[in-house]
């Protein structure tokens, strides 16, 4: 899975590519051709509670 700064071209690589937001990150997933998977961003840091 590649880490990219921009997902604009990544979502246009294949007609089955979808943009999904999970845990504060943006993912491009492609079930028919998994080599097009990529991610953008970092998750927000978790707040430690006592």
UniProtKB/Swiss-Prot annotation:
SUPFAM superfamilies: Ribosomal protein L36. One of its GO terms (cellular component) is ribosome. InterPro entries: Ribosomal_bL36, Ribosomal_bL36_sp, Ribosomal_L36_bact. PROSITE patterns: RIBOSOMAL_L36. It comes from Pseudomonas aeruginosa (strain ATCC 15692 / DSM 22644 / CIP 104116 / JCM 14847 / LMG 12228 / 1C / PRS 101 / PAO1). NCBIfam families: PRK00831.1, rpmJ_bact. Keywords: Ribonucleoprotein, Ribosomal protein. The keyword Ribosomal protein applies. This is Large ribosomal subunit protein bL36B. Pfam families: Ribosomal_L36. It comes from the Bacteria. The keyword Ribonucleoprotein applies. GO terms for biological process: translation. PANTHER family: 50S RIBOSOMAL PROTEIN L36 2, LARGE RIBOSOMAL SUBUNIT PROTEIN BL36B.
């Amino acid at each position: 899975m590649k880490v990219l700064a921009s997902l604009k071209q990544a979502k246009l690589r294949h007609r089955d590519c979808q943009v999904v937001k999970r845990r504060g990150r943006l993912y491009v997933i492609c079930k028919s051709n998994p080599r097009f998977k990529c991610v953008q961003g970092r998750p927000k840091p978790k707040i430690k509670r006592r």
